[in-house]
């Protein structure tokens, strides 16, 4: 008893090893929370939340089988102080908010009030991801969770427009008799925002489109528009028979193909007061008969937080052969879709006989164009890939042309699964390419049926195929198996996946979803009961071990060649379950096609989960006798003991299988008489000959279909849990900058009882563009035999781009909610990545508001700038020369504006062309921004005492993973935006930095500094505004940070040097002037001085010694 307990403990520990991960496929799909932000929440409703300019207010209650039980559960939670948490997430964001208990209309509800800026600060109209919301409550060992969506209504582009005249619901129903088909398209980033269009007959003219923001869950969420006049306004002549043909909603544009031409909307991001207008694309030589057979092709990708290399492409194809006057029957364009160019390279334009282009798609991950050609004469299909150069396909193929087999005789088109690199070609077969169109793998063969439509969900990776006969098939992106899920009986319908992956069937006047919230992901009620995927033939089981069995499918000798496929196992049976009419089931692990043994052209290897029921003597009397087996040519003769009278072969024994432990099994094909029958061996090499088997040593299985098929094949229940530890989102987007790497972990946990331990990989990993990043994988089996994979991706080239990284549980059932995870890795700069200056002294935000924050000596560290302030220049404090105003107010006078040079400079930015500061519309963030672009709004700056020496310029990089100090190999340049010069930088220069400086500085023409240990000294006064820029080549990001320092209490300048200089100049000038005047008057001071000296000498020499003595005595 100890071993199971230990095992359970280890299992639990390993399950919670990824503390931040979510385990999928656990069948805990019962939805317990009902929530709404538009009135009182309704029970059993999908959670649809909407974000407007005001706060997001959400009310939730705990729903059970009745109101009394709900209140009882709430009292339990309340007494325990429990309340649910709300997770809001998309591919790059994850926020957690907590509910509070409140009372509303005698109902106990949980309430949360979230300011919009706590979710997003952006209000501009752009392609923005719809958020997923997950409401979770932990109570003991129970985890109650419910998922929903949150749509930012004010930012979604298409919702800001009125594309035509609004049609009342009562009027739209009058069009139903004239509708011949439906077309649906959805927003790439918010799949709950979708458009539904009517294709009408020639009796009714017009383009009629319905727009929903709630994923077609309710009729009242759809607004209908008549766009007829909008389209007619672009036609220069009078036309008739206008109808929608196809449409595509891209990230920023709506493209509509009608019977009278192709029309492209204006940019949806810039709404105006008028209705949405369109421009018409001109295709020379094409008429209505061509347009009604046209198709639009689009590689759906979400461009939220758009990169410069991300752009939408749309292709239009026409079902006609090119003539000498026409350049192509296939055209493509990139946004803004103003110029449509032929899909074929120029080298093919002169060729008269060339295969028809069925589809042309742009693979943005690899930068290629993928073609699907079809030769109607030879009935052959090929795929070709060309490199795009300047957005035009190269005439030379990137890979060798892939030729589909002749069995792919009716190709229809190609499609990329959204946000991935999985490429599907479909028609009477389905082919999958995981390497950009270089090679394809056969997924399904429908023979005389043709797949006409495909529908995709990026969230669950689900794909639905619909054939021209109305049969519906499903698979998961990247998987090599598929299932039949039923059929559609309506003549006019279309399918649609919403943002949470629910499948909807849209018909005239009725929208059906794939089940209530308690049946998440279940599509069976849309298409009836799950179909039996068996086929009309007999199976012959052959045991190979106690838990492994092979089923051989019988093909009669007289079976027509064209119907042999209907008697064989196919790809559809891979991963399914064989059920016996009695008891027993087995999981199909492998499908085999072969030509021997005779009569068996296919087989499956299956793992027995439950033993199959044997025939009893009362069902087959032959079991009461011994059995003699003799070979008779290509068949075997089975003979019963003639002494046992009651033992007889009967017609009901035909297609039953004789099982002999240790030998080949035999399928009975005919009865010769009561004691003799003919059979074929499943394994002739191990078949006995001229051997007798006693009673009870041989057995009979009945897997025949002569008296009604006794076996069935259904989908296998989900057999794996999937967990990843990085984000609650399945479709995360991660940015990898130059020199950086990213690690992603995932775990696959078996949940089947009695499963076999197989040391084989349970995950397959595909990289969309293997040339972009260096991707490595490390796999292990943990103590519970769960499969753990660690993926490391690192940048390796100075090239920006994106690639999808697909994790596929290849052995999982298609019934699993999650079999495929497709994160996107971008070799680029994250929009969340920025550089920040760390102030040397922290000042709380409330002190910034008040403008007072004093240090220990009473010195205020905040300076409120004068109105219309400009920093001084090198010419003096009173002569500012910068264009930047601070604390701008156009209604107030401008100080320091007396000199002509100062009057010529100085320009308002935020306050340009307004008369008061209030009209500048400065936001709170702009008022405290260090950016020079918002200097008009800046009012307060950090204040320091003179002098500033060795001020540490500390910088850090902030991204979604945290904060990292800025250090080498990042190098920076530093400038003062107001052109002040009395400052100096000091930094350490190691040998490696020294070499980089020598290489970079001549190129940049500026000094480069090491950010580690960077110090600043300032000798001037008043405001200094610095900009720090990381040099290019070491990051994809444009990392720029600005900071300001106000230097106050600077002493007056010492005048000694100036006075000495002036005195010296005056003395020298006076001497030079006197010398000039002497020269001008002819006065020679030197000569006069010399004569005076000589006269004195002569006079002194004429006096005698006695006279000198006499003079000295008289003086005494």
Curated annotation (Swiss-Prot):
InterPro entries: CATSPERB (IPR028748), CATSPERB_2nd (IPR048788), CATSPERB_C (IPR048789), CATSPERB_head (IPR053903), CATSPERB_Ig-like (IPR053904), CATSPERB_N (IPR048786). The chain crosses the membrane at residues 1054-1076. Pfam families: CATSPERB_1st, CATSPERB_2nd, CATSPERB_C, CATSPERB_head, CATSPERB_Ig-like. Its main location: membrane. Residues 1-1053 are extracellular. One of its GO terms (cellular component) is CatSper complex. Residues 1077-1116 are cytoplasmic. It is found in: Cell projection, Cilium, Flagellum membrane. Component of the CatSper complex or CatSpermasome composed of the core pore-forming members CATSPER1, CATSPER2, CATSPER3 and CATSPER4 as well as auxiliary members CATSPERB, CATSPERG, CATSPERD, CATSPERE, CATSPERZ, C2CD6/CATSPERT, TMEM249, TMEM262 and EFCAB9. HSPA1 may be an additional auxiliary complex member. The core complex members CATSPER1, CATSPER2, CATSPER3 and CATSPER4 form a heterotetrameric channel. This is Cation channel sperm-associated auxiliary subunit beta. The gene is CATSPERB.
